């Protein structure tokens, strides 16, 4: 399954990348100011969205906390 991370290169984003690597998940990282702007990020995910935002498969899962819960619920660990 392909995953996507919208990242600002913060420590939280690096944790999300390590998580996906550890569960052998293929992913693509989109980086703030290289692949998208902050305005585009908030237009897509909302004004209160924080980095990282993660999609697994074709579905947006949310931030790191929501992604961890999804992975736990789906026995991905």
Give, region by region, the residue ranges found by the protein language model:
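Short phosphate-engaging motifs
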Residues: 12, 37, 63
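Conserved residues at beta->alpha junctions
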Residues: 7-8, 32, 58
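Non-catalytic, surface beta->alpha helical segment in thiol-disulfide oxidoreductase systems
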Residues: 56-77
